[in-house]
Structures are given as C-alpha cells and as structure tokens.
Regions:
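Structural recognition of alpha->loop->beta junctions
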Residues: 220-242, 393-402, 458-480
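Radical SAM [4Fe-4S] cluster-binding motif and immediate context
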Residues: 276-439, 461
C-alpha cells in the first residue's frame, strides 16, 4: 500500500476549527519546569477526543506540580493534513480504493460530518451514508498505508512524508520525555515508529501504555525492541507518576515491561481499589473539542475500571484492568459530569466494559437528581435485572441507546460463551428498553467454536423476531484471542487444534479447528451472505452502525420517537448452504 499512495511533503497546515463548544482553558504552566508530551497516534475514526491522555494529564499535573503535560492528538492532526494534501494535490488516492469519487466530493466529508455542509447531517440519510462511507474508506486506506510505511522503514531511509511531518510537529514541542497512548491495534506500527525515532534522535525517555496492551505486552517489546523504554501494563496513573519521579527508571514500578540485561522483564501490575483517588474530570484543555468530526462534541468517560462479569470465554478486554472491577463513587461521577457540562459538553460515551443493572439504576438516579440535562450511550449485557423501572430511569437520565452484548440467539452457544444470559430474558429486555425510549444496538457473533449453521440461523431468527425494537446490528466472526479462556483450554470448547496463522506484535493471529460446527470460512461466508438484511436495521442510515458517537447525536437531536417513525425496508434474508447455494430463510417476515 505504501507504494500506491502518492504523497509530496508540504508545510504543516492545521484543519480550520469550527465554531461551537470552546476548548477547556488550560491550567497555567507557571512553575512547571518539565514537560511530558502524551501522543495519540493515527489512525482511527476522529469523532471524539482520546480519553487516556486527558486522564493522565489531569492526574500528573495535580500530583507533580513541576510537570506540565501536553496531549497531542496526532490522529486528528493526521486527518487535517490528509484533507489539506488532497486539496493542494500533493496526495492522490488511486481509483481502486475510492471508485469514481471525485476529490471535490471527498473534500466535502469534514464539513458534512461536522455539521457545516449544505447537506443536513440530521435529515439527509443518503448524504450521511455517502460521506460516512467515504470517511470509513479513507480511514482504512490511509491507516493501512501508514502502518505499512512505519513497519517498512529502515534507519537512513526517507520517512513517509506524513510521518516525517508528524515527527517534526512532535519535535517542536521540546518535551523532556514522551508518552504514547494506544487503544487500537492499527495504531501500534505508527506508535512503535514514533517511539523508536524519538528515542534515537532525542535521547529522551519514551513510555507506552493504553488498553490495547491487554495481553502480549512482552511480545510487543520483542517485536518492536527499540520502540519504548517502558511499557505500562494496567492502570497508567501511578506507574507514570513513579516513572517521572525516577527519571524513567522502571525499578519498583507496577506493571512496567522493559528490557534488562537482554531480557524482557515484566513487573506485576497493581490495581488501586479507590479509583476516585485518580482525580476528577479528564483534562481536555489541549484539545479543541469542536475540531472533531462530529456536529457537537461527544466526550468519552470511564466511570469504572474492569468488568464485573469477567467470565465471557472469548474475551480479553477486561485484562487491562486485571481481574478487578472498581467503580468511581456516584459523587465523583456527578462531579466529573458537572465539570464537563460546565465546559459546554452535554453528550457522552460511557466507555466502561459494561454497566450492571443495579449500578445503572443508581447512576441514573444520581444523574436525574443532579439535573444535568445530558445525553449518553453505554455498554451492557441484557440480563433480566434490567427491569422496566430501571430502563425508565436510564431513559430519563439521558441514555439514548445501549450497545447490548447479545452475541447469539442459541442458548447452547450462550452457555458455552458463559454469558450468563437467557434468550427469553434478552428478548424481554430489548422490548422493554424500546418501550421506555432507549434505542437498542446489539452485538452478534458468527462462528463460535462448534456453532452450527442452524445455530447461527437461530441468531438470525432472534433478530427477525425482535427487529421492530432493534436499531443496529454490530456483527463479526469469532476470532481466537491469545489469553482468552478458549485459548487456554481449547478442548473444553470442542477445539481440536489451534495454530498461529500470522505472527503479530501482540501474540499473533490464530486459527482453530473444531470437531463439529462451521469452519471460520463457512461462518464468514454465512455472515457475508446476510449482510444486506443486517444493514437494513438502522432506521436512518447504514453507516450509523459504524460511527457510534454520531448515532448518539442523531437520537438526541431527532428523538427516539422520530426514529421509530422512519420506514425500514428489510430484504428477504438469504443464506448460503454448505454447498454454496443461496436459500431463502424459513422465517416469517415479521
């Protein structure tokens, strides 16, 4: 890919800011004699600001008065540069990636998704799908290009022009040390390159962290041996503070992963029970929230650490917080929300692993009592604890939609997943949530070990039975994650053989073979064959399933009742038989 994009280096240009919410005013830097630059590398969708750096900035500047922390969203900067380069002709994207889309059409994307274009973000669904698809495609093309360019670079060779500009921008900050915070695996190659070059060219310390380091952190350091002085596994606040106090020495730093005498050393992480001690609202003062690719700012907030369930057999997400679940007090949550609403932010994504029904009820009560007037979305598991009265409180507190972990419509598969859910309970929760004015987005999975075609058809039947109360289907094919319960004990799940297909920085991509059920290829083909049906669930636009923050703003702006009134046209879903023959589904249309 690096050879297919034609880039010519140009002077750095910032994307013009839009009017609207003003950036939070920074804490005065007087008295701060040292600077830590926290970098969020490209490339991922830029609809909202990165949370990790803002949380660390607030904590470190409170705890270490001599340190000034600057947060640099290199991801957002990268999008601004890409569109500037398209505009001046120094970047050309081959037709095979963008089809017959003109450069002029592509250049309309930022204004549209920021709510500034002539087409209405909230009313023109066709325009939303068109520009949303262009943004998603551009993200994939540029992201793959940068990842390959970063991995292919050798010392002494010229850097990719965009990466060279990024390093020039970073160098201009004259920081005393650097942190790189990453969430998504596609950020890893660029982050590793930045760390490597910064260490070589400046001699300064470079620290890595972020929720992508859930497993395989030691493998990452072997894969990219010169990328970082220390990687922090787990909560970042106290380890980063200690690293700064010790001039980068990892001695005694919990969760530190580093080289020592030619070996990778992994200090065991520690998890502070009282997360209120980490402070209040994240400090977004270095970031203009109005510059993000949404009509109004949507701020991510983390109200807890870890997962209260921690038993899903396919999952490793909770591992970044260890086997813990720690909640902010409701008093601290309301304090954080008050701070953010005082800065003009009223839309939030609660990015907790998931919120339990009892805690959700208390959280909703606290938000209602505080009279905050916010809107938000969150993740949860549709258990029978979500009674109508709890869902009613959630809606009254500003919950516009929930991403529910449904996963399957087959009880046998749910039990193998150890989800702790029942098919009939999930249906009731979804119907009750809809009745109370909450939009339902659901996750489903195809190809769990030993799942048969008939069992995945059960999932499709589940969706069909409940499609009048479902607004979006987020779907994927099962992937074997290193460190997951299935990976550790495959025989228990009918997995006869596992093997590494492609080595990667975080432990490889793995395949598996089961004694029964679909192969991964069969599951992929089956899921692909029903995509037209699944895409029809969103009442407004297909791409709303891709941009979560945009879905929140749409529901807040137009209301759930208006969404219900929109017509939806479901094609008769068809699926592939084992022989590859398309068959109509034996399911009634309603």
């Amino acid at each position: 890919m690096s050879s297919t994009l034609n880039m010519e280096q140009q002077p750095i240009q910032s994307h013009p800011a839009k009017t609207g919410a003003q950036p939070v005013q920074p804490v005065p830097a007087s008295g701060r004699t040292r600077t830590l630059l926290l970098i969020y590398p490209p490339l991922t969708v830029p609809t909202s600001p990165p949370l990790g750096g803002a949380m660390l900035k607030g904590y470190i500047e409170r705890e270490l008065p001599q340190w000034q922390v600057k947060v640099l969203d290199l991801n957002l900067w990268c999008y601004g540069r890409v569109f500037a380069m398209l505009r001046d002709g120094s970047l050309r994207i081959p037709e095979q990636f963008m089809g017959n889309t003109s450069t002029e059409e592509l250049l309309r994307v930022p204004d549209f998704v920021m709510g500034k274009g002539p087409a209405d973000f909230y009313e023109d669904a066709a325009a939303y799908d068109r520009y949303g698809r262009l943004l998603a495609t551009l993200t994939g093309v540029i992201g793959e290009h940068l990842g390959r360019a970063a991995d292919d670079w050798k010392p002494g060779a010229p850097l990719d022009p965009l990466l060279a500009e990024a390093l020039q921008l970073i160098g201009g900050e004259q920081a005393d040390c650097y942190g790189v915070s990453m969430i998504f695996i596609q950020q890893l190659p660029v982050g590793a390159l930045l760390g490597r070059v910064l260490r070589q060219q400046t001699g300064k310390k470079v620290f890595f962290g972020g929720s992508c380091f859930t497993a395989g952190t030691d493998n990452f350091l072997r894969w990219y041996p010169e990328s970082a002085d220390v990687i922090v596994d787990g909560d970042g606040e106290e380890p980063l503070k200690k690293l700064l106090e010790q001039d980068g020495s990892p001695e005694g730093v919990s969760g530190a992963v580093f080289w020592h005498n030619g070996q990778v050393v992994c200090n065991p992480p520690e998890y502070r029970r009282d997360i209120d001690a980490y402070g209040g609202a994240p400090d977004f003062s270095n970031l203009n929230l109005a510059d993000y690719y949404s009509p109004q700012p949507v701020a991510p907030l983390l109200l807890s650490r870890g997962c209260y369930w921690r038993r899903c057999t396919f999952c490793v997400h909770h591992m970044s917080a260890g086997l813990t679940h720690r909640l902010h007090s409701l008093e601290r949550v309301i304090e954080i929300l008050r701070q953010m609403t005082g800065q003009g932010v009223r839309h939030f994504s609660f990015v907790d692993e998931m919120i339990a029904p009892g805690h959700f009820a208390n959280l909703a009560d606290a938000i209602i009592a505080a009279g905050l007037g916010i809107s938000y979305y969150a993740l949860a598991k549709p258990t029978k604890g979500f009674k109508p009265e709890i869902l009613r409180k959630m809606a009254q507190s500003g919950c516009k939609y929930v991403l529910w972990g449904v996963e399957s419509g087959s009880q046998r598969i749910l039990d193998l997943m150890d989800k702790g859910t029942r098919v009939e309970d999930m249906e009731q929760v979804l119907r009750d949530a809809h009745a109370e004015g909450i939009a339902n987005h659901v996750y489903v999975m195809a190809g769990f070990p030993t799942e048969t075609r008939a069992e995945f058809i059960d999932t499709l039947r589940f969706l069909t039975r409940n499609r009048e109360v479902l607004y979006s289907i987020h779907r994927g094919v099962f992937a074997l994650e290193p460190g997951s319960p299935i990976f550790k004990n495959p025989e228990r799940f009918g997995v006869m053989r596992t093997w590494e297909v492609t080595p990667t920085a975080l432990g490889g991509r793995w395949m598996h073979e089961c004694a029964s059920g679909m192969t991964r290829q069969e599951a992929t083909e089956l899921l692909t064959s029903v995509q037209p049906y699944l895409r029809a669930f969103h009442p407004y636009a297909v791409m709303m399933a891709y941009f979560r923050d945009h879905a929140l703003l749409l529901y807040a702006q137009r209301g759930i009742a208006a969404m219900r009134a929109l017509p939806r046209h479901f094609p008769a879903w068809r699926y592939l038989t084992r022989g590859g023959v398309s068959r109509p589904a034996a399911v009634p249309p309603g």
